[in-house]
């Protein structure tokens, strides 16, 4: 298939995904009239429908593109991301979902005020919610820019603007009621879009003799040319078949060969030509040989791999319990029992999905290894079907993947924007429907420049940092607020400030470029890139210690509050907390 025909087919698939999102959102939001409709879909969403919607919004750019990219680049240690993303719902199922729904709250800040009776705590929680959602929106917009650039050759800024516009239109039109339909539909679209190519490539792999765990990096199957967009350091295991034009180790070369294995710095604009069968250079910090890639313990680039893995587990498992756009969906269930059933169903849906990006990451290393040269492995899922299969079938699979990628950005962005709008409209503005819509517009626009600034950060790493902030703030607030009677507003505020401040600073530094990897044996760079293993325990400890010191300020009716959260609804203790309806 010609490149023009492929571009047209891909553009059609992207347009289909975007248009179907708008139409499904309009259908879902056609009856949205009240504040309850916009914030919690009138608490009338059943477990199966809600589970599909939660899975649809949770499977973000990091899940659809980033997991496969990390597996292709780093191998076995990258599997902790999908494991943690899924296992986090076990924590939600056991500790949070039912008590949170029984509280009657409609946002996380509202739960904070319900539990501890502090408007100051509510304000701090609102700020934390907005920060987490903005940090999480950044990789969604970032992934949209990458997708349109790779598939259609469009400027990077068009992706964030297009996704932002569509999401704002959906959220403004019907709030939670609208995006519930959108997200449930998009889960099945994403599952189809990633499962069909993965199974097709699995059939190709089973008939292939390619080796994953060999002593060399993967080799290209045909002559391949790679252009370096930014300066990069690569590790060359076997220089045979590689010629370079441009800048190597700050020296200008023209159609030169590399003299020996080793590390080389390639300057911007440098072109590498790999003959068919040549071993691919690999970006420094990633596993070089097949044996290194298939073995665990190497981490995800940089120093201190064991700490990296531990921090990833903490961030993904506990961060899920602190994601505002996930938590708010449990407010839409009719009762606590339905919330628990929803969380259980989500675990099954996510487990089914994450099998396929893992497979695609393995196949990407075999069939598009040239991505390992620049380290831009997030593009692997987008390029893999056409590169490995080719022809009409490959083009069709590539278009299907493109539709799924756009669905991933739109679904997650919709949930995040509802959380931002709900927090701002009820805690900063007057809680009217028009305030919700205004907050949605502002919340959708602000992350666009941040996404453009963070374009060099891998998608799963970007999302992992947002998880670290959530795990360091709202997770301790919810776990201690639901299960420990001794929590006070002073302790909660102190923990939010300590956990949020430290993880927020680390995330900001990581987005703008971090620090030198060689400083102090690599610890500053590692702590900035993976802060959760430090910031989460500090947040819990701060809340407990300060609460002990301020025990006299604990709410006097804590027994009644706990009864409301933990006693089944059929005993009649529940009270719904919703702002007054107004246009």
Question: What feature does the model see in each segment?
Answer:
Residues 1-583:
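Membrane-embedded helix-loop-helix hairpins and adjacent transmembrane boundary segments
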């Amino acid at each position: 298939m010609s490149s023009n025909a492929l571009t047209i087919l891909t553009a059609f698939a992207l347009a289909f995904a975007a248009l179907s999102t708008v139409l499904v959102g309009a259908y879902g939001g056609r009856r949205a009239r009240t504040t309850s409709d916009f914030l919690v879909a009138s608490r009338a969403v059943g477990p199966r429908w809600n589970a599909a919607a939660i899975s649809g919004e949770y499977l973000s750019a990091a899940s659809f593109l980033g997991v496969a990219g990390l597996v292709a680049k780093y191998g076995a240690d990258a599997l902790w991301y999908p494991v943690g993303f899924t296992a986090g719902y076990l924590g939600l199922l056991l500790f949070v979902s039912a008590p949170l729904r029984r509280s009657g709250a409609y946002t996380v800040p509202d739960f904070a005020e319900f539990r501890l009776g502090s408007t100051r705590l509510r304000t701090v929680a609102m700020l934390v919610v907005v920060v987490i959602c903005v940090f999480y929106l950044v990789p969604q917009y970032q992934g949209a820019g990458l997708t349109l650039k790779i598939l259609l050759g469009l400027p990077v800024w068009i992706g964030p603007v297009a996704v932002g516009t569509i999401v704002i239109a959906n959220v403004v039109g019907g709030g939670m009621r609208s995006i519930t339909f959108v997200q449930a539909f998009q889960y099945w679209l994403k599952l189809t879009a990633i499962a069909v190519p993965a199974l097709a490539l699995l059939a190709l792999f089973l008939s292939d003799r390619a080796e994953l765990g060999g002593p060399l990096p993967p080799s290209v199957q045909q002559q391949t040319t790679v252009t370096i967009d930014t300066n990069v350091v690569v590790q060359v295991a076997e220089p045979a078949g590689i010629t370079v034009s441009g800048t190597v180790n700050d020296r200008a070369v023209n159609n030169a060969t590399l003299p020996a294995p080793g590390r080389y710095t390639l300057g911007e604009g440098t072109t590498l030509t790999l003959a068919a069968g040549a071993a691919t250079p690999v970006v420094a910090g990633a596993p070089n040989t097949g044996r290194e890639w298939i073995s665990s313990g190497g981490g995800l680039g940089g120093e201190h791999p064991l700490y990296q893995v531990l921090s990833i587990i903490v961030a993904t498992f506990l961060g899920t319990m602190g994601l505002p756009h996930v938590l708010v969906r449990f407010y839409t269930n009719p009762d606590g029992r339905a919330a628990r059933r929803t969380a259980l169903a989500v675990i099954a849906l996510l487990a089914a999905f994450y099998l396929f990006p893992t497979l695609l990451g393995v196949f990407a290393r075999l069939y598009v290894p040239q991505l390992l040269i620049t380290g831009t492995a997030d593009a692997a899922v987008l390029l893999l079907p056409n590169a490995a299969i080719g022809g009409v079938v490959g083009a069709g699979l590539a278009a299907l993947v493109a539709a799924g990628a756009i669905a991933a950005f739109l679904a997650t962005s919709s949930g995040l924007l509802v959380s931002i709008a709900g927090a701002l409209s009820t805690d900063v503005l007057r809680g009217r429907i028009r305030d919700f819509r205004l907050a949605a517009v502002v919340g959708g626009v602000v992350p666009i420049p941040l996404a453009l600034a963070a374009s060099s950060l891998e998608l799963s790493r970007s999302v992992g940092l947002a998880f670290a902030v959530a795990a360091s703030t709202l997770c301790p607030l919810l776990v201690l607020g639901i299960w420990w009677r001794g929590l006070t507003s002073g302790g909660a505020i102190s923990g939010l400030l300590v956990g949020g401040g430290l993880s927020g600073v680390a995330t900001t530094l990581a987005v703008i470029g971090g620090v030198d990897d060689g400083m102090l044996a690599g610890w500053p760079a590692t702590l900035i890139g993976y802060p959760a293993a430090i910031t989460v325990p500090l947040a819990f400890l701060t809340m407990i210690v300060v609460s002990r010191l301020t025990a006299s300020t604990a709410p006097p009716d804590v027994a009644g509050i706990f009864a409301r959260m933990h006693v089944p609804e059929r005993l009649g203790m529940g009270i719904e907390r919703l702002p007054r309806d107004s246009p």
